[in-house]
């Protein structure tokens, strides 16, 4: 996965003093820094990054053009049907779209043999896509090495 590492950059990641005050060391220690590629004009992407930071993730963002973002998604071989508005890379996984922090923490704790997590289609009520009290059901998908996906977590399911 050298290409992923090259995208993330090998420089050390820093978390500001405020982050250390908010998140206990035990939480910070289990989280890896990651890089998020997004459009500079996408408000929902910025809201998702803010949400992830509030949940303890150390994120470096890189604003890129739509063309550059498509090249990154193609290089990572993210299936078209699972694509969304922003792409992150953490360790050997990619994170596509409005994936909840709890799902990413679960992925990092379990370390499945997979390529990444995806929440396609920007569902209303997913992190960064809040619209009042409306919360549409959505699935976070685990995309396996063969590009097949299975449901990793279901969200906003009415029972």
Q: PLM features: residue spans?
A:
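N-terminal secretory signal peptides
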Residues: 1-8, 16-22
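Sec/Tat signal peptide C-region and signal peptidase I cleavage site
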Residues: 25-29
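Local sequence-structure signature of Cys/Sec-based thiol-disulfide redox active-site neighborhoods
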Residues: 32-47
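Short active-site oxyanion
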Residues: 33-34, 58, 92-94
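Stable alpha-helical elements in mature extracytoplasmic
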Residues: 48, 65-68, 100-104
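Conserved helix-turn-beta segment immediately C-terminal to the redox Cys motif
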Residues: 51-60
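Thiol-based oxidoreductase modules, predominantly thioredoxin-like and allied folds used
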Residues: 59-70, 90
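Thiol/selenol-based redox catalytic cores and closely related redox-interacting motifs
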Residues: 74-159
